[in-house]
C-alpha cells in the first residue's frame, strides 16, 4: 500500500496501536488511506488489470469485514456460485459443470462482465448491504473503503465507482453484487 509498511513493521505498529485502531473503527471515525494503483499485464498483449493495494492497516480491517460479510451472506449465495467462496474453486465449478453435462444438458451460457470490479455501482451495492446488515457502522465503513482515493505515483484521484481488485473485501462485495443475477439465472 501507500504506507510501504513491511510485515515486521506492521506487527510492531499493530502491537502499539491495536486498541486505538479498534476504538476508531467502533466509533465510526476510521478513514481508509488511499489505495496504491498497480497495473498488472493481462494475457492479451497491451491490456492491463488495475489493482488497488490497501495499506497494511486497511487490509486487516478489510479482512475482518470480509469475514463478517461472508458469515452473513454465505447462506443466501447461490449453490452454483464458485468464485471467491470458502471451500469452492475452479475445480468445484468444473466438477459441477461435468455433473450437469452428464445429466444431459447441452447448452452453456458464458458471461464475462467486462471490467466488473472497476464499474461496481456504489449506491446499488450499499443498498444491498443496508437491506441485509443490521449494523449501519459496517455499511458506513464499507462506503468509506469504496470511496478511498486511488494513488498512482504522485497523483491521487477520487474513487466514485468500482471496488478495487487487490483488497480482501472486494471479492465478497462482488459476490453480493452478483447474487441477484445468480439466482435469476437459476430460475431460468
Regions found by a protein language model. Name each.
Residues 2-27:
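Surface-exposed loop/turn segments and immediately adjacent short secondary-structure elements
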Residues 17, 24-34, 38-39, 76-80, ...:
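Conserved polymerase palm-domain catalytic core
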Residues 32-54, 58-59:
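Conserved beta-strand/loop block within the catalytic cores
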Residues 2-6, 67-80:
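Charged boundary/loop elements
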Residues 1, 51-59, 119, 171:
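Ordered, soluble secondary-structure elements with a strong preference for glycine-centered loop motifs
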Residues 41-47, 69, 154-158:
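Residues forming anionic-ligand binding surfaces in small-molecule and nucleic-acid pockets
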Residues 51-69, 75:
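Hydrophobic alpha-helical hairpins/lids featuring a short glycine-rich hinge
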Residues 46-51, 74-77, 108:
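Short small-residue beta-strand/loop micro-motif enriched in glycine and branched aliphatics
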Amino acid at each position: 500500500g501507500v504506507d510501504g509498511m513491511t510485515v515486521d513493521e506492521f506487527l510492531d505498529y499493530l502491537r502499539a496501536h491495536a486498541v486505538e485502531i479498534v476504538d476508531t473503527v467502533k466509533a465510526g471515525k476510521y478513514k481508509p488511506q488511499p489505495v496504491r494503483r498497480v497495473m498488472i499485464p493481462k494475457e492479451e498483449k497491451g491490456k492491463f488489470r488495475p489493482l488497488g493495494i490497501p495499506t497494511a492497516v486497511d487490509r486487516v480491517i478489510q479482512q475482518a469485514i470480509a469475514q463478517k460479510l461472508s458469515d452473513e451472506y454465505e447462506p443466501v449465495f447461490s449453490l452454483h456460485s464458485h468464485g471467491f467462496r470458502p471451500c469452492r474453486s475452479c475445480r468445484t465449478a468444473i466438477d459441477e459443470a461435468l455433473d450437469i453435462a452428464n445429466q444431459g444438458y447441452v447448452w452453456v451460457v458464458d458471461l464475462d462482465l467486462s471490467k466488473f470490479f472497476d464499474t461496481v455501482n456504489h449506491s446499488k451495492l450499499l443498498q444491498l448491504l443496508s437491506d441485509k446488515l443490521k449494523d449501519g457502522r459496517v455499511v458506513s465503513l464499507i462506503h468509506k473503503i469504496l470511496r478511498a482515493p486511488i494513488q498512482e505515483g504522485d497523483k491521487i484521484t477520487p474513487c466514485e465507482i468500482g471496488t478495487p481488485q487487490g483488497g480482501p473485501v472486494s471479492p465478497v462485495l462482488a459476490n453480493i453484487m452478483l447474487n441477484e443475477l445468480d439466482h435469476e439465472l437459476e430460475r431460468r
